[in-house]
């Protein structure tokens, strides 16, 4: 009975401290919009507008100042309208160092938000190019966002709102895997080849280097265990699509009105 009582209090602690965010209104309700039905031309318009910006901001990022990135991203979050229901980032909120970093790398985890103490964590082996987008993603969870798709949307938007060109590029690059996934699934073979050929070779090379970096650290056994547990966790907390929710950020972007897409994709 004692063990059951402890588990019950852990359960209560989780939902009181942060887990209650899984029961808040959806992004669509807070934004006052409806989920968009797939429209091929609208998707292509977004795709090529996004790609133009991705190519324009493409650059090499060899080092990154964590403090500068955190300051810039927090400034961007302070520009977000109150209607979306995010809390205001505080100066004392900084990502914590992982004690067993290699285990998280082995699972392919770049960062996470610890719900019990409301702390964000960033993998110390993350590449400089990925740091701004990942930090912005994890900070959104700390500010009350439970959906992974919406966390990606805010990571994308807040990076684009930065005055720093490298942070902007991290935003575009961070969205690239989800754009790529959607393009592969929605476009016919000819259209897909035409689109992917429009992406700068430097971007493709950086994407390959990123994948190789994490593949070299990945443990199939740890990855499979973590993936199964995380899938169970997400589906048990009203994220019915599980880990596929990450890629649903594109659907959120396409559901925004035209001026919203322009602001998010062409800033």
Feature-to-residue mapping (PLM):
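Short helix/loop segments within enzyme catalytic domains
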Residues: 156-188
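Active-site recognition of the HExxH zinc-binding catalytic motif
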Residues: 133-152, 156-157
């Amino acid at each position: 009975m004692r063990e059951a009582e402890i588990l019950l209090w852990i359960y209560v602690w989780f939902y009181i401290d942060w887990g209650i965010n899984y029961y808040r209104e959806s992004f669509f309700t807070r934004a006052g919009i409806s989920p968009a039905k797939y429209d091929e031309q609208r998707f292509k318009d977004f795709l090529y507008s996004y790609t133009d910006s991705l190519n324009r901001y493409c650059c090499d990022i060899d080092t990154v100042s964590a403090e500068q990135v955190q300051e810039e991203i927090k400034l961007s979050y302070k520009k977000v309208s109150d209607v979306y229901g995010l809390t205001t980032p505080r100066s004392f909120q900084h990502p914590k160092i992982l004690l067993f970093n290699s285990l998280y790398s082995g699972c392919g985890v770049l960062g996470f938000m610890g719900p019990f103490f409301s702390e964000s964590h960033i993998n110390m082996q993350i590449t400089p190019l990925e740091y701004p987008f990942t930090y912005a993603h994890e900070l959104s969870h700390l500010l009350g966002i439970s959906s992974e798709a919406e966390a990606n949307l805010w990571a994308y938007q807040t990076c684009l709102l930065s005055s720093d060109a490298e942070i902007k590029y991290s935003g575009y690059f961070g969205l690239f895997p989800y754009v790529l996934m959607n393009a592969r699934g929605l476009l016919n073979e000819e259209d897909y080849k035409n689109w992917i050929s429009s992406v700068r070779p430097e971007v493709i090379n950086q994407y390959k280097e990123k994948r190789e970096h994490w593949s070299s650290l990945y443990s199939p056994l740890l990855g499979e265990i973590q993936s199964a547990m995380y899938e169970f966790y997400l589906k048990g907390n009203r994220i019915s699509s599980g880990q596929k929710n990450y890629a649903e950020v594109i659907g959120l972007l396409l559901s925004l009105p035209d001026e919203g897409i322009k602001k998010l994709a062409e800033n």
